[in-house]
Amino acid sequence: MKRLTIAVCLLITGIALSVGGFINLKFICRDMKKSVNEIIEAAEKEDAGETESKCANAEKEWDKKNSLLGVYTNHSEMDELMMLMKQIRQLSADKEYDELIEKCRESVYRFEHIEETETPSFGNIF
């Protein structure tokens, strides 16, 4: 009976950690998509000051969340996202709004892709 109790406790702990990680991943991706979409809106207005401030906010948020996101995702995805975030910051400083919007949309797509690939499904589990 002791072994069964221990096994059930370990199973419940594993499930709780998995669900918690999944929820945390969703929040991280949602917050980052929101930040990047704010950059897109500012860049479409071609407002240099607002675009710079939105980029700075997104960069701060990225710095806080990228290490945790790296725990949940493939490292090649993280490398691509890191490159995109650096390019976004540089394009904002250079006031290259068309290319900035393109890179922002690509990063939003990457965050959506991470959400989709990490969503539990029969294909992902088996």
Regions found by a protein language model. Give the residues of each.
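C-terminal-biased regions
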Residues: 1-41, 52-126
